[in-house]
């Protein structure tokens, strides 16, 4: 297999890796054909503009939250243990209140007709600043009595956690039975987070998981297309007894959890209704309406749900809800990238450094693929040894392509060379490369993870381009170990391709470039050893098999 085929395969791998989502977009879930009167009323309620916030600030060891005292919305959430993508001196802000972008969590109580019973009422809190004391901090917002109902909204933040419990405490003194439902929403605009680029682009938008429909992405563009097609609002509605829904972006997520791992579903009183749509104000929302059991006069009740708003740390989210780890966006190769990351994580637990874990993983992958790559490289080595004879055939027959081809095929037979012997092994390595790309690119565990020296964040590009330059050098070295091409154009390609690949890798995460560099070094060692072995066999007059 010559270098032209080799680079072609790697180019195919990169094209597939970068363009897969565009070539094979996620199918749209089937929308419900019609809304009920209650659904339309909920939609009208959701269209209310985001009012300016009266801030209540909550600070724990993991987050700083800003809650609007009037509406009770969670309008800003700063993740204190993560740095901003564009400025490492600032913490990462997940939720935004509309100054830079809009991304908030809202919750309401609805009557039987779908009307927000707290609309225009407003909450109040005993103080404006809360901080963690002990394992938990509770923020209680109280609303004036309305319709004979006394309602409190309670946020509970837990030490060391990104789970926020949102609870309504309801006391019915209305003189009649109250039939209510709780509506929970995550609302955001379509702006992309910092750090998104052509080579480092990940999905941003709504996601939903239900046992009936499994995991689905409902992209902003899908919702926009439906809105442009003539619908006043694009909606995806379904009923479910359990699941989760929310928004994801690169490394982070926010999801309402309908059933905690090993716990009871919040939909115990009846199926919950999930609704994903583009609103009239051009904001996008994922919401779930949870029916409550009837509250008799004089009785008390509560509606409680967990919101996970934080990093997509596999070991954490896998224990929060069933299949929540699917929100970690490995693209179309989740089935392959997920076990690769599992192995990488196990190595990290032993070694304690993600960079060295990547190096050890590269060695393991190389060892597993050795039988395949060895056959490929032996084929290339035999082609390299036969290169002078191939050049002589080309010079002898000149433009007589038919005679030239026949002579070359006879040479391949005499030398026991299979010109396509290296193709299949290289093709089988493409899924490995794509899987590793997504395993390294999508994993928040590598965010801000140092290796050594100048590499302080394996999830970002090498700031000094040292690794891409080393990678280019290793690719140039490989060209001298491969069969020299007889075509002058191919010879030029051999010199240009390492430069092209290194420029592309300037923008790739340092962790991925590190993998590629180590893989190249191992390949050089393997190819050099095979070349020397075959040359020695030929020098001794042995038949090379």
Curated annotation (Swiss-Prot):
Q: A single Pfam family, by name?
A: 60KD_IMP
Q: Record keywords: Transferase included? A: no
> Entry's InterPro entries?
Membr_insert_YidC, Membr_insert_YidC_N, YidC/ALB3/OXA1/COX18, YidC/Oxa/ALB_C, YidC_ALB_C, YidC_periplasmic_sf
Q: Which UniProt keywords apply?
A: Cell inner membrane, Cell membrane, Chaperone, Membrane, Protein transport, Transmembrane, Transmembrane helix, Transport
Keyword Transmembrane helix included in the entry's annotation: yes
Q: What GO terms in the biological process aspect are recorded for it?
A: protein insertion into membrane; protein transport
The membrane-spanning stretches of this chain are: 350-370, 424-444, 461-481, 498-518
Query: What is a GO molecular function of this protein?
Result: membrane insertase activity
Which Gene3D superfamilies is this protein grouped with?
2.70.98.90
Q: Where, per UniProt, does this protein localize?
A: Cell inner membrane
Question: What membrane topology does the annotation report for this chain?
Answer: Multi-pass membrane protein
A GO CC annotation given for this chain: plasma membrane
Q: Which family does it belong to?
A: Belongs to the OXA1/ALB3/YidC family. Type 1 subfamily.
Q: What does this protein do?
A: Required for the insertion and/or proper folding and/or complex formation of integral membrane proteins into the membrane. Involved in integration of membrane proteins that insert both dependently and independently of the Sec translocase complex, as well as at least some lipoproteins. Aids folding of multispanning membrane proteins.
Assembly description: Interacts with the Sec translocase complex via SecD. Specifically interacts with transmembrane segments of nascent integral membrane proteins during membrane integration.
Q: What is this protein called?
A: Membrane protein insertase YidC
């Amino acid at each position: 297999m010559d270098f032209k085929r080799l680079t072609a395969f790697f180019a195919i791998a990169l094209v597939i890796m970068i363009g897969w989502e565009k070539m094979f977009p996620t199918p749209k879930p089937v929308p419900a054909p019609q809304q009920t009167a209650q659904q339309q009323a909920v939609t009208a309620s959701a269209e209310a503009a985001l009012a300016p916030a009266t801030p209540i600030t909550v600070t724990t060891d993991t987050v700083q939250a800003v809650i609007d005292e009037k509406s009770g919305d969670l309008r800003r959430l700063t993740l204190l243990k993560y740095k901003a993508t564009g400025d490492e001196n600032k913490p990462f802000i997940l939720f935004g209140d509309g100054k830079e972008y809009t991304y908030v969590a809202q919750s309401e109580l609805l009557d039987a007709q779908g009307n927000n019973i707290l609309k225009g009422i407003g909450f109040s809190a005993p103080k404006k600043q809360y901080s963690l004391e002990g394992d938990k901090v509770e923020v209680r917002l109280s609303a004036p009595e309305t319709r004979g109902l006394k309602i409190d909204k309670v946020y509970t933040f837990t030490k060391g956690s990104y789970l926020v419990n949102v609870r309504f405490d309801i006391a019915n003194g209305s003189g009649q039975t109250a039939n209510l439902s709780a509506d929970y929403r995550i609302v955001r605009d379509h702006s992309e987070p910092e750090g998104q680029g052509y080579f480092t682009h990940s999905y941003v938008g709504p996601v939903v998981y239900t046992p009936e429909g499994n995991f689905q992405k409902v992209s902003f563009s899908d919702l926009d297309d439906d809105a442009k097609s003539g619908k006043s609002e694009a909606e995806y509605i379904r009923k479910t007894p359990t699941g989760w829904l929310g928004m994801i972006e690169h490394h982070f997520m926010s999801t309402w959890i309908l059933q905690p791992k090993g716990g009871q579903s919040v939909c115990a009183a009846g199926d919950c209704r999930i609704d994903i749509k583009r609103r009239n104000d051009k904001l996008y929302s994922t919401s779930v309406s949870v029916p409550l059991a009837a509250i008799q006069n004089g009785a008390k009740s509560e509606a409680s749900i967990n919101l996970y708003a934080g990093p997509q740390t596999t070991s954490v989210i896998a224990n929060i809800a069933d299949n929540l780890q699917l929100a970690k966006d490995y693209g179309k190769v989740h089935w392959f990238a997920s076990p690769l990351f599992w192995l990488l994580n196990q190595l990290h637990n032993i070694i304690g450094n993600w960079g060295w874990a990547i190096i050890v993983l590269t060695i393991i992958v190389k060892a597993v693929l050795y039988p395949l790559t060895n056959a490929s490289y032996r084929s290339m080595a035999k082609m390299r040894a036969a290169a002078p004879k191939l050049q002589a055939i080309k010079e002898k027959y000149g433009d007589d392509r038919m005679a030239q081809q026949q002579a070359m095929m006879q040479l391949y037979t005499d030398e026991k060379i299979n010109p396509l012997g290296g193709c299949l092994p290289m093709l089988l390595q493409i899924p490995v490369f794509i899987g590793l790309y997504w395993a390294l690119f999508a994993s928040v565990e590598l965010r801000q993870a140092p290796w050594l020296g100048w590499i302080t964040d394996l999830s970002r590009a090498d700031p000094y381009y040292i690794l891409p330059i080393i990678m280019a050098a290793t690719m140039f070295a490989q060209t001298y170990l491969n069969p020299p091409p007889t075509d002058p154009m191919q010879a030029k390609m051999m010199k240009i391709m390492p430069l092209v690949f290194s420029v592309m890798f300037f923008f790739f995460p340092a962790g991925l470039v590190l993998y590629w560099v180590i893989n190249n070094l191992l390949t050089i060692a393997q190819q050099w050893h095979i070349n020397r072995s075959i040359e020695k066999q030929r020098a001794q007059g042995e038949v090379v098999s």
